[in-house]
Regions:
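Cysteine-centered catalytic environments shared across enzyme families
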Residues: 1-288, 515
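Alpha-helix initiation and N-capping motif
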Residues: 11, 76-80, 133, 145-146, ...
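Short, solvent-exposed polar/charged micro-motifs at secondary-structure junctions
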Residues: 38-39, 197, 290-295, 458-465
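Residues that form generic nucleotide/phosphate-binding pockets
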Residues: 78, 82-86, 139, 151, ...
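ATP-dependent adenylate-handling active sites, centered on carboxylate activation for C-N bond formation
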Residues: 102-105, 112, 123, 180, ...
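Short, conserved sequence motifs enriched in acidic/basic residues, glycine, and aromatics
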Residues: 142, 411-412, 486
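Short coil/turn segments at secondary-structure boundaries
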Residues: 161-171, 220, 226-227, 403-405, ...
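PAPS-dependent sulfotransferase catalytic core
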Residues: 340, 348-352, 445-505
Length: 525
């Protein structure tokens, strides 16, 4: 939630606020300006820190809205320590920049929610920080081939190391230490794995589940500027329902799919919108298809929302109405895990589909890249209070949302809610039974009956790729990932042919993953 360009020798000087930024000599730290964020600069003898954090409901104003000018708060050592501890223990997301003027030493510390991570590149005498990884494309960067290989193989990975060598993502609770000539990233201690409790006859977990939902949704002062992404699924419906139960004035936005899934998605969304009284607007995925151009305008970041074009239309629509806080259903898939030995139907993804994607992805790799992809990684971030896949989703979507003026909020990724749900007995987790009961009690049992058909984007890309097959073939006569020895060009064209012939979801997923990485890699060619 900051952008910064800091010459380390400037850290020996005193900081000041100027035009929405903290200025130190010729260096500048600029918080992301948004009504849901606040910032504060606290200064004592030879030390200071800047915190940019999510605003919390019902708290007094230590900080000013991020981006607004506010004089530094000069305090003694005792008050500095007190304020520092209060910021470190902040229950919502935050980013802290801490400076010791003696020695020009700096530490950047991230909060535990990973809502909008920042990226950093340190050299002997300078550090650059940004919430938008595309900013680093302006520099002559080299690819980290080990990271890129694992991503080509579609391995789930949440780590500080990123596709550009020397660029680090500050993962949740991580700290980056920098001083002239030295840099060191430290991961936090892992969070202990959860375990379900035994079933107890007569227990009803629904009241406690609803209370945890309400606490998470009410944690931030939303006002009248909120939008919820409403796909028509249980996760986003749960978020919309709990926000309306709190009296939140709420708009909804959704992407309408094509094909058979539309026949169930549209009426289900309509029921939710009508029963919650939402100000709704939609776009059709057919009108905003994903861009398959391998030479798009503008720099590309490390991650991308595959359906960015349709999402941008929704975000722009919300922004035009003054709505700049976007509630999402991210985290819902991770609330009700299956533990070893439990047969849990209704999993988020079919294992056969996952296996097909992995096989197709590995088939693209050269022998040396395949061996690298099969090696175990030693650089992943440890387990945290927010599930890893939720953190990955946040990192993929946040930069695009911030560019469009939207601050993302994921109530279903709240650590206390996650911990509660992960300890539920099997009967409450099976088939998301507790969430289904919650929705039935507020929306009616007809909206999400047992075994309802879930909406999916699975059928969007295959026909689109088939229509653009000739153009893609022509664009892939040159391949940056092949030039650095990671993929076999003939295997890429063979996979494209497989997608055109079969429109298989697994093959399409592997090809789409390759196309995005190839587009990104061409920036460094």
């Amino acid at each position: 939630v900051i952008k910064a360009d800091i010459a380390l020798h400037d850290l020996s000087l005193a900081p000041s606020w100027r035009n929405g930024s903290v200025v130190v000599g010729h260096s500048r730290i600029t918080p992301y300006a948004h009504r849901m964020l606040e910032s504060c600069l606290v200064v004592t003898t030879d030390r200071w820190f800047l915190v940019v954090r999510e605003r919390q409901s019902g708290t007094a104003g230590l900080a000013a809205p991020a981006g607004e000018p506010r004089a530094p708060r000069h305090v003694d050592e005792e008050a500095f320590h007190y304020l520092y501890q209060a910021c470190v223990l902040w229950p919502l997301d935050y980013l802290m920049v801490e400076v010791a003027r003696v020695g020009c030493r700096l530490r950047i510390r991230a909060g535990m929610l990973g809502s909008a991570p920042v990226y950093a590149r340190a050299t002997n005498d300078r550090i650059t920080v940004s919430w938008d990884s595309a900013d680093f494309a302006a520099l002559p960067m080299a690819l980290d081939t080990e990271v890129v290989t694992h991503r080509l193989a579609m391995h789930t990975m949440y780590a500080a190391r990123q596709p550009y060598s020397g660029v680090t993502m500050l993962t949740e609770r991580a700290s980056l230490y920098v001083e002239p000539g030295k840099a060191n990233l430290r991961y936090p201690d892992p969070v202990a794995a959860s375990a379900p409790r035994d079933d107890r006859d007569g227990d009803d977990d629904l009241p406690a589940f609803e209370a945890a939902l309400r606490r998470s949704a009410a944690a931030r002062p939303v006002g009248e500027h909120a939008t919820v992404e409403l796909s028509g699924g249980m996760d986003s419906a749960t978020v919309a329902t709990v926000l309306r139960s709190l009296g939140t004035t709420l708009a909804s936005r959704g992407i309408l799919l094509d094909g058979e899934v539309r026949d169930t998605q549209v009426p289900r969304r309509s029921l939710i919108v009508d029963r919650l009284g939402l100000a709704d607007a939609t776009v059709d995925i057919a009108a905003w298809p994903p861009d398959l151009d391998m030479a798009p305008a503008g720099a590309q970041g490390f991650y991308r929302e595959f359906y960015l074009e349709a999402c941008m239309a929704l975000w722009s629509s919300a922004r035009s109405e003054g709505r700049d806080t976007l509630f999402t259903g991210v985290g819902g898939d991770e609330l009700f895990p299956a533990y070893a030995g439990e047969g849990m139907p209704g999993a988020a993804m079919d294992p056969g589909w996952v296996g097909e994607s992995a096989t197709c992805a590995e088939g693209l790799l050269t022998p040396r890249a395949r061996e690298a992809a099969r090696s175990l990684r030693t650089f992943d971030a440890p387990a945290g209070p927010v599930p890893m896949t939720s953190l990955i989703a946040n990192s993929c979507r946040a930069p695009d949302m911030l560019r469009h003026g939207q601050w993302p909020v994921a109530p279903l990724g709240d650590p206390q809610l996650v911990a509660f749900c992960h300890r539920l007995p099997r009967a409450s987790r099976r088939g998301r039974e507790l969430m289904r009961r919650y929705l039935a009690s507020h929306l009616g049992a007809d909206v999400f009956p047992p075994g309802y058909s879930k909406e999916t984007f699975a059928h969007v890309l295959p026909p689109l790729i088939a229509r653009h097959a000739l153009s893609l073939t022509a664009q892939l006569t040159q391949c940056a990932l092949a030039d650095i020895g990671l993929v076999e060009p003939r295997a890429v064209l063979a996979l494209l042919d497989t997608v055109v012939r079969t429109q298989s979801h697994g093959a399409t997923s592997a090809l789409a993953n390759f196309l995005w990485l190839e587009r990104f890699a061409r920036q460094t060619a």
